[in-house]
Amino acid sequence: MKSCALLLGVCVLLAGGCHQHPLTDYRPLDQAGMWSSGLEQLKKLDTSDSEVAQLVKAKQARLSDDTCVALVAAAHERKHPFVSGDATANLAGAGYSEAEILEIGRADQLDSISGDAVTLRLIGLSDNFVQIVLRRHLQGLRTLSSPEIARLKNTGLTEKQILERINSGMTDAQADHEIAVREATRNNSGTGFSRVRGRKPR
């Protein structure tokens, strides 16, 4: 009985020490251009097949092996698999650096803020403005959504004026109200009727 119990204990320890995904197929990443050193690091992180599929998207967006490995490690530190291949690729396509993408990943906000972050780039705002807004997102501070920022910009507000509103804690609802007022004022300006004076008939 003691020998059976000991054998059972050893089996449990071995099972606990084994990777949960020993049969993961890393060939898609190899084909996507990842070096063997990167693949070995992913094996140590017990990367799953689904994570490999997500990382292929990141590699296709030309992210380095080190960043890919770091993103998986960051996700595992948060106790979940890496599932943000699309968000990562979109951020890279919008011009965000690998350091910025990794910072967002370590904050566990790739999926939650990638849409807004990409839109900020598409609006045509300065790098400084984008960095300030992104920093507020990462710090959990109230920040206007990208669509509202774009609409405020279209009403003629400067980046400085928009930042003043963001720093004051303006909500999307408040921004929507100001946009409506500014658009109404703009549309009504110059629409008054003026009397046309013509030459009197002889």
Give a label for each model feature:
Residues 5-15:
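Bacterial N-terminal signal peptides
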Residues 18-202:
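General marker for long, soluble alpha-helical cores
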